[in-house]
Design a protein with these regions (language model features):
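PP2C/PPM-type serine/threonine phosphatase catalytic domain
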Residues: 1-299
Length: 299
């Protein structure tokens, strides 16, 4: 049976920032991504009605040689798996496909490293949204949020050495936020420890009016959660909200590339699903009535 589409208003914006010589971030929105290098700023806007929406941010690791290449490999691998992504119907489907994409992208980056001798790596933060599930996964420190009428929730978990110290109880969240290790990634695309290559995964439900956000650490490192929440609480178009987040990060003197992907749920598909179920129920009821009448007539 054909799936039920949902409608999202989406905006993606990336900016090189004030201190970096090149932009090593990339984004992916339902098949659209930055397909060239030496990008200072880029944006994408759309209102899409799809059965499955896929959005992602890949932040190339600036301390390595070819971070932009690693980020490009991340988004092109998503593009190469478009058919599998569109076939997702459940959270289990999403998890299986996402982990396969992560392994494929990681393998491609390792092969590139072996071929060129240049070190590279990238974060990976992805959302899959459909009428039946909202699935999130991340490698590294790119963040994922959902803002609902009840508040804002972070769906990602930083995969950094500082976060590992927090998880072990060695330091507090506040101490980790000030530590050097907060930007040292423990997991990322391009790592050679394949046993540790496991993204953080989470899920949620979406409703009409919810706001979804994926951003690189050039934004999340300098903007506290209450500032992000204030921006996401606006009724303005999502492209304006995206611009506001970038502008806020610039005012905070973010020294990194900055990328945001924002989506507002315009139609969560639940009304259409209810109508379909009601139609099926009525069809079954009508069939039972007709069968009963036929049996009675034959008797």
């Amino acid at each position: 049976m054909k799936g039920i589409p949902i409608t999202l208003e989406i905006a993606a914006v990336t900016d090189i920032g004030r201190r970096r010589a090149r932009n090593e971030d990339n984004f992916f929105v339902n098949g659209a991504f930055i397909d060239h290098y030496k990008v200072r700023a880029e944006r994408f806007e759309s209102v899409d009605t799809e059965e499955v929406h896929v959005m992602a941010v890949c932040d190339g690791m600036g301390g390595l040689t070819d971070g932009d290449v690693a980020a490009m490999i991340g988004v092109t691998t998503l593009s190469d798996h478009a058919d599998e992504l569109q076939a997702i119907r459940t959270g289990e489907d999403a998890s299986f496909t996402a982990n396969r994409i992560v392994r494929t992208a990681n393998d491609r980056i390792l092969k590139r490293i072996k071929k060129t001798g240049k070190k590279m790596g990238s974060t990976f933060a992805m959302l899959v949204a459909s009428v039946d599930c909202l699935y999130a996964c991340n490698l590294g420190d790119s963040e994922i949020y959902i803002k609902t009428r009840f508040g804002m929730e972070r769906l990602s978990k930083p995969q950094t050495y500082a976060q590992e110290l927090v998880d072990s109880g060695a330091v507090s969240e506040n101490q980790a936020g000030r530590s050097y290790g907060r930007n040292q990634l423990s997991k990322y695309l391009g790592m050679d420890n394949l046993k540790a290559l496991k993204p953080n995964e989470s899920s949620a439900e979406i409703r009409t009016g919810d706001i979804l956000l994926i951003c690189s650490d050039g934004v999340s490192d300098v903007l506290p959660s209450h500032s992000i929440y204030a921006s996401l609480s606006s009724d303005r178009p999502v492209n304006e909200i995206a611009d506001t987040l970038i502008e806020k990060a610039l005012r905070k003197n973010s020294g990194d590339n900055m990328t945001v992907v924002i989506a507002r749920v315009l139609d969560d598909g639940r009304v259409a699903r209810l109508r379909r179920r009601l139609g099926i129920a009525l069809g079954i009821t009508a069939g039972v009535v007709m069968l009963t009448v036929m049996i009675a007539w034959m008797l």
